[in-house]
Amino acid sequence: MGKVIGIDLGTTNSCVAVMDGKSPRVIENAEGMRTTPSIVALTDDDERLVGQPAKRQAVTNPEKTIFAVKRLIGRRYDDPTVAKDKDLVPYKIVKASNGDAWVEADGKIYSPSQISAFILQKMKETAEAHLGQKVDQAVITVPAYFNDAQRQATKDAGKIAGLEVLRIINEPTAAALAYGLDKAKQGTIAVYDLGGGTFDVSVLEIGDGVFEVKSTNGDTFLGGEDFDMRLVGYLADEFQKEQGINLRNDKLALQRLKEAAEKAKIELSSTTQTEINLPFITADASGPKHLTMKLTRAKFEALVDDLVQKTIEPCRKALKDAGLSAGEISEVVLVGGMTRMPKIQEVVKQFFGKEPHKGVNPDEVVAIGAAIQAGVLQGDVKDVLLLDVTPLSLGIETLGGVFTRIIERNTTIPTKKSQVFSTAEDNQNAVTIRVFQGEREMAADNKALGQFDLMGIPPAPRGMPQIEVTFDIDANGIVNVSAKDKATGKEQQIRIQASGGLSESEIEKMVKEAEANAAEDKKRREAVDAKNHADALVHSTEKALAEHGSKVGEGERKAIEDALADLKEALKGDDSEAIKAKSNTLAQASMKLGEAMYQQQAEGDAARDAAQDAAKDDVVDAEFTEVDDDKNDKKSA
């Protein structure tokens, strides 16, 4: 069995880690960074960029640079939270044929799972480069408050990326694993996790290697991106007041504002004032316009105060569900880049009544926890037991559109529960089971996960047939539902696939596309390598010809010059095979030149050695007389 890696698939940044012996280790990417921006860009020449290279070109290619796609994963296009994002991102969010929110770039539409798969592929390649072996299994983290559709979509992303996802693990739980491993601590901790796009809070009991989640709560559409967008809105409004130009209509300006807002937000965590300076942000008939503005920490905190306060209600609910007061929490662990913001730390301290623990790296701790869980599954990490919970209640729609819960929220998983229902009409021969997830009393107000029919029920008065509905949640938090007619033994079951979601055939198609893209990327990389090698060969040959061309015959020199001209011509195109062939021809033709250079060097070395030997022969040995000190000592009187 190869290595199982742990991946934190984040909204803003992603991170990959692996167990190195008994210790988890974060792996640096090709750019030497420990985290990778969760950004994918498609360039004009059909190249796909992921991570830092994608982020670097975002300003000049805003419509084809996709970021924060995790906020769309497993969501419907008509979801109000999607509508909110649609106006704020420079790329296009479109409605897929299944009603899900997808993204469009370069005339093609991509599912959020596909875009996430490109990021996961980058994580996979990062791990493979470090380990020197193929990696095809992973533990991937998701926000604790992700519903079934979002978990399934994340698992699909792993499959498209060529990874077998052994476990989907909740981010706060992963952070608790990283915090609690190798610590002899016992007690109840709260993990406050405010990342780039999601917020979670989990209450856990830790002791003797057992990590038991007591409750979890959160908001899957609240994170650093919202703080950035709030600042973008403020900057755009101020500029419009001053210049009368709405920057929201300019995709390029919007992307520059987004980058400036993120930078200012980060700076204000360590300084009380920053300056935002964006020259040539736009232009009108009177000429170019510049945006220059000073922003204080106090002003920024006032702009986002409601977002900060929004994190407190989930904390309150999580404590209530766990049956605990804030005073009974022994430690509060901060996770996610947003927790570096002083205002967040202050609010957490006020609510829990204690200084939060800042001893973990908020950007890396989740990936480290995922690697530990990978180690547990591989058998490398012993004596660790993780007991997680389902974040939302699961149930079915019953008569009158009521949501009847079968599994309550915060139930430890894996779990299996059954309940018996009956028919609503006389002689009813089929029932439709509609499955929902959520906390509202009416089914329609909750998240519809899917539906299926149980057919062939024998005719009987209403209320007589006994239909047993069973919910089975696995360790990934993914749901299976079955319905059985107890009289006939007939059973119907489904692995929940949201009314949206990706079908098996769609996933297979995307897997094949990803493999084809990987092959295409490899070809493109080989072409770049061939060009680089050819450029270096041209340079070295020209230099050698200039310095040593006179040492070879006229015919040999002409052969080298012709091969050089052919290679230069080939370099004007993109045919890597032609470039390789012409490079080989030039290398062969240049061999005589190389021989002449080496011969000259050998002759020079021989002459130098001869000169040194002659110099040695001319050395005169000095004559000396040994003096015996004892004989020279005068005897004392």
Swiss-Prot record:
<dbReference type="InterPro" id="IPR029047">
    <property type="entry name" value="HSP70_peptide-bd_sf"/>
</dbReference>
<dbReference type="InterPro" id="IPR013126">
    <property type="entry name" value="Hsp_70_fam"/>
</dbReference>
<dbReference type="Pfam" id="PF00012">
    <property type="entry name" value="HSP70"/>
</dbReference>
<keyword id="KW-0346">Stress response</keyword>
<dbReference type="GO" id="GO:0005524">
    <property type="term" value="F:ATP binding"/>
</dbReference>
<comment type="similarity">
    <text>Belongs to the heat shock protein 70 family.</text>
</comment>
<dbReference type="InterPro" id="IPR012725">
    <property type="entry name" value="Chaperone_DnaK"/>
</dbReference>
<keyword id="KW-0067">ATP-binding</keyword>
<feature type="modified residue" description="Phosphothreonine; by autocatalysis">
    <location>
        <position position="198"/>
    </location>
</feature>
<dbReference type="InterPro" id="IPR043129">
    <property type="entry name" value="ATPase_NBD"/>
</dbReference>
<feature type="compositionally biased region" description="Basic and acidic residues">
    <location>
        <begin position="605"/>
        <end position="619"/>
    </location>
</feature>
<dbReference type="GO" id="GO:0051082">
    <property type="term" value="F:unfolded protein binding"/>
</dbReference>
<dbReference type="GO" id="GO:0140662">
    <property type="term" value="F:ATP-dependent protein folding chaperone"/>
</dbReference>
<keyword id="KW-0143">Chaperone</keyword>
<feature type="region of interest" description="Disordered">
    <location>
        <begin position="597"/>
        <end position="637"/>
    </location>
</feature>
<feature type="compositionally biased region" description="Acidic residues">
    <location>
        <begin position="620"/>
        <end position="630"/>
    </location>
</feature>
<dbReference type="InterPro" id="IPR029048">
    <property type="entry name" value="HSP70_C_sf"/>
</dbReference>
<keyword id="KW-0547">Nucleotide-binding</keyword>
<comment type="function">
    <text>Acts as a chaperone.</text>
</comment>
<keyword id="KW-0597">Phosphoprotein</keyword>
<dbReference type="InterPro" id="IPR018181">
    <property type="entry name" value="Heat_shock_70_CS"/>
</dbReference>
<protein>
    <recommendedName>
        <fullName>Chaperone protein DnaK</fullName>
    </recommendedName>
</protein>
